[in-house]
Regions:
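Charged/polar low-complexity intrinsically disordered segments
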Residues: 8-12
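Hydrophobic beta-sheet segments that form the core/acyl-binding groove
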Residues: 86-123, 218
């Protein structure tokens, strides 16, 4: 099912799309024209752009269910927290064609975390695939909670698994790592959860490595 947003009949489209979403097997799809701000140092859309697309798609997907971070903190005292990203970059893209982004929730045995799969294509060719892991956090108690606590649709997951390596279990401390630089968090870095917004982590991650690192791998 393909849903495109426009300026006309917005309420009618929303009512129709919400009915489709709540019926299950919902795969969100939309087109986006890349912008200069999303380009890497070489001028093409690559790591930075795709990771930002992943975040945009994942949050927009939750908004489609009516369960985005714009509303659930006030309604339930709960927020989404994205904890892991994995991306496979197939090829970089330019600015001549829009990218098509598909997002869906993968079926899992556990409800403690949610996995959103994302596929990006450009001009009919696969550009990147990825998976985002998120969890729901009770903002007052500070512990994890389940999707049922925000009345999330039980049939939201799609029986379609992305062919991508599983997440790596990360260490709980910084032993064996080197400090490369420090960053002071300011007001514009924070989000509704009073934590650093995920949008900032993309640049922080990329700046942890020098230019030679990327030249050898891209």
């Amino acid at each position: 099912m393909r849903l495109l947003c426009g300026s006309q009949n917005v309420q009618k489209m929303w009512d129709m799309s919400l009915e489709i979403i709540l019926n299950g097997d919902y795969i969100m799809e939309y087109d986006y024209m890349p912008q200069l701000r999303e380009a890497d140092e070489n001028g093409y859309i690559g790591i930075r752009g795709y990771l930002n697309f992943f975040q945009d798609a994942a949050t927009r997907h939750m908004h489609d269910f009516g369960k985005g971070n714009d509303t659930i903190p006030e309604q339930y005292g709960i927020c989404w927290m994205y904890t892991k990203y994995r991306m496979h970059l197939v090829e970089e893209t330019g600015f001549e064609h829009p990218v098509t982004i598909n997002t869906w929730i993968e079926k899992m045995k556990t409800t403690a975390v949610t996995h959103q799969a994302i596929e990006i294509t450009c001009n009919g060719k696969q550009a990147a695939t990825g998976r985002l892991e998120s969890c729901l956090v009770d903002m007052k108690a500070g512990h994890l909670t389940k999707p049922s606590c925000i009345d999330f649709p039980e049939n939201a997951a799609v029986d379609r698994q992305l062919q991508l390596e599983p997440f790596t279990r990360l260490p709980k401390n910084a032993d064996g790592t080197d400090e490369v630089y420090r960053y002071v968090i300011r007001y514009t870095d924070t989000d509704k959860n009073r934590h650093m917004t995920n949008l900032r982590y993309v640049n922080l991650l990329m700046d942890a490595f020098d230019g030679a690192f990327y030249e050898d791998r891209i």
